[in-house]
Amino acid sequence: MHSTEVQAKPLFSWKALGWALLYFWFFSTLLQAIIYISGYSGTNGIRDSLLFSSLWLIPVFLFPKRIKIIAAVIGVVLWAASLAALCYYVIYGQEFSQSVLFVMFETNTNEASEYLSQYFSLKIVLIALAYTAVAVLLWTRLRPVYIPKPWRYVVSFALLYGLILHPIAMNTFIKNKPFEKTLDNLASRMEPAAPWQFLTGYYQYRQQLNSLTKLLNENNALPPLANFKDESGNEPRTLVLVIGESTQRGRMSLYGYPRETTPELDALHKTDPNLTVFNNVVTSRPYTIEILQQALTFANEKNPDLYLTQPSLMNMMKQAGYKTFWITNQQTMTARNTMLTVFSRQTDKQYYMNQQRTQSAREYDTNVLKPFQEVLKDPAPKKLIIVHLLGTHIKYKYRYPEDQGKFDGNTEHVPPGLNAEELESYNDYDNANLYNDHVVASLIKDFKATDPNGFLVYFSDHGEEVYDTPPHKTQGRNEDNPTRHMYTIPFLLWTSEKWQATHPRDFSQDVDRKYSLAELIHTWSDLAGLSYDGYDPTRSVVNPQFKETTRWIGNPYKKNALIDYDTLPYGDQVGNQ
């Protein structure tokens, strides 16, 4: 008599699935959790790292008996990529992104060796050892995840479809978006997960580099300004242009706001007669790229494409013999910021201080102070220094250190009807203004300390509506539903004693003139003593020939979208509008 043993079918185990998830999630979500807990960014990174790390479950589901081998091979790749990203964050306090790749590829050999040397410290070695030990421990806990046939194929396809194929199908075939844009969006979502941050980062870097190269080649082919003259003399000089971000003057005590949000600039204004505060300057577009395409070029609302066909302010200053510098705390290589990088690359030397993956991350503008001091020491006889700040860009609470929330919980001088979340945002914005005040004042003081021959101009690219206009429920910027606070900006001019001695001018009669930032290049040319075919003194706010014209705002590429700023209704009279 023969006995037959029936081999039991392996059973599905939730515990085995849990360990598999924990193993693959570990390599990406740990860093995202650290970033979130430290308050440097929100929850999107955690969400996307969890989702796209789950793709590695597919081969585990399909070949359960080989889970240890599969997990080891994949794990080595994930370990290397995620450890590099973790160490980068520990050293620099920033996520790895395509901006990092841009800076790395643009870095010379000496700078690259200094950069890599940061990775070889006892602290980093200990972190790497601990990280590796946890990864190995999780690997030892892995057990086969048995899903009966054909369900293992169904579940695997569902994962692939839900995370990859569905977004592609929806955007490409249903929403009719270009396939390239669909891939860009998907790559952006996958970026927090290892090793996608390197793969998608490189893909996005190449995409932006191609666009960047094309725009730079077109700019380099532009003819110089005709009949160009520099009538400012032959003395060595330094000119500084500081570009702020999302700062509306109505929330600055410098402009009459009852909260003391600009104490350092207030003090400078009272004690330094060479600091001139212009009261009636507005921006033409409430978006960074769009306004700088006008403010830094000859383009304006009526001629928005001139930035493509005529030299920029940076080109103009190089034509005048200036050595030019660009120091930025804005993101470098993103689809949105390509034009900023084009502008920066029109200068001789660039300092990119912000390689964050997202703008909604903690990055403080004090980053620019050290390179600014370094550039001030450069021996070039004629220097132009452009400093681009993050200013008071949303999220406002990420623009200043957590322990510097002076207005947290404050209800004084607050519009009526704000709920708790709106009040927090309102106060965060004032805290951001307070920190921005310190940065701008520090730049002026550092410049002044060098006993320079020159001047400094500061303006914000656009304003920001933060529950200022009744019914006090709007926050942000919307060109199709404009308010005054989206367009009202600070505009400051500081002139040195040496410059004032050789270029004596009284600006006191100019401070209340109605002016649009779109015409900045004419004011800058006037201040710098430059003339050329196309220079128009009637469009310089500091020129005796100045003529007030309609201050157009709106999208110039949209039919009948331009409107006169001065026809907008006033908000509450809490500050200068």
UniProtKB/Swiss-Prot annotation:
NCBIfam families: CptA, PRK10649.1. CDD domains: LptA (cd16017). Its EC number is 2.7.-.-. Pfam families: Sulfatase. It is a multi-pass membrane protein. It comes from the Bacteria. Disulfide bonds: none annotated. It is found in: Cell inner membrane. Catalyzes the addition of a phosphoethanolamine moiety to the outer membrane lipopolysaccharide core. Plays a role in the pathogenesis of E.coli meningitis. Required for invasion of E.coli K1 into brain microvascular endothelial cells (BMEC). Contributes to E.coli traversal across the blood-brain barrier. This is Phosphoethanolamine transferase EptC. The chain crosses the membrane at residues 17-37, 44-64, 69-89, 119-139, 154-174. Belongs to the phosphoethanolamine transferase family. EptC/CptA subfamily. GO terms for cellular component: plasma membrane. GO terms for biological process: lipopolysaccharide core region biosynthetic process. Keywords: Cell inner membrane, Cell membrane, Lipid biosynthesis, Lipid metabolism, Lipopolysaccharide biosynthesis, Membrane, Transferase, Transmembrane, Transmembrane helix. Pathway: Bacterial outer membrane biogenesis; LPS core biosynthesis. One of its GO terms (molecular function) is phosphotransferase activity, phosphate group as acceptor.
